[in-house]
């Protein structure tokens, strides 16, 4: 604060989305880098390929860079940004964990993708539990899903599924 007023950069500003899906198979990606001389985006395999696509500086001179990509197949797409040759996360776009690191992603919906939409049906709960590992002695985390209507005080038994994510990601990949 300066003289009782918040600094301008501490205020929320309306920002256009960094990922937009204006039509099937089309994605618009935006990155804020006002001092950059070059911004690129590349997919991690999949429909975007590994090609570096050079983004164009916004004509509004507002620090944003943008690119529109077409023919992107439906599904989940990891991608990464390069600002003046340096790999960077886009803080304005969704960030997940894959390829052994935090990484940006987007999901291109398709005709058969309605199964993962938030539908109007009963939902269970997901909680993170912490425990001390008897092997390492360290605090670890696990995620517990309980079905709709589950009551911790109830004596009814429920089946258990133990699910461990494989190489390159972690357990959050199953719940986000």
Label the model's feature ranges.
Residues 1-33, 109-120:
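Non-catalytic, glycine-rich low-complexity segments
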Residues 20-22, 28-74, 84-111, 146:
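Aromatic-rich carbohydrate-binding modules that target alpha-glucans
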Residues 35, 132-135, 148, 166-168:
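Short, flexible loop/turn elements at secondary-structure junctions
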Residues 64, 121-129:
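Short, hydrophobic/aromatic-rich segments at coil-to-beta transitions
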Residues 70-72, 134, 155:
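Hydrophobic loop/turn residues within beta-sheet-rich immunoglobulin-like superfamily modules
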Residues 136-153:
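A short loop-to-beta-strand scaffold at the N-terminal edge of the catalytic core in hydrolase folds
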Residues 150-176:
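Short substrate-entry loop that stabilizes the transition state in hydrolases
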């Amino acid at each position: 604060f300066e003289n009782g007023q918040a600094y301008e950069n501490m205020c929320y500003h309306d920002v256009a989305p960094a990922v937009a899906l204006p039509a099937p198979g089309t994605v618009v990606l935006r990155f804020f880098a006002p001092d950059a001389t070059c911004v690129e985006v590349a997919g991690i395999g999949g429909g975007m390929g590994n090609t570096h696509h050079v983004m164009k500086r916004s004509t509004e001179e507002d620090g944003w860079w943008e690119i529109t990509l077409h023919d992107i197949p439906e599904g989940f797409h990891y991608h990464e940004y390069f600002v003046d040759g340096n790999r960077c996360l886009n803080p304005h776009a969704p960030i997940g964990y894959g390829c052994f690191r935090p990484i940006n992603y987007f999901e291109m919906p398709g005709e058969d993708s309605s199964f993962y939409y938030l539908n109007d049906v009963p939902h269970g709960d997901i909680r993170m539990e912490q425990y001390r590992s008897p092997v390492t002695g360290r605090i670890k985390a696990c995620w517990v899903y309980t079905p709709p209507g589950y009551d911790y005080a109830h004596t009814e038994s429920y089946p258990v599924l133990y699910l461990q994510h494989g190489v390159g990601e972690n357990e959050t990949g199953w719940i986000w």
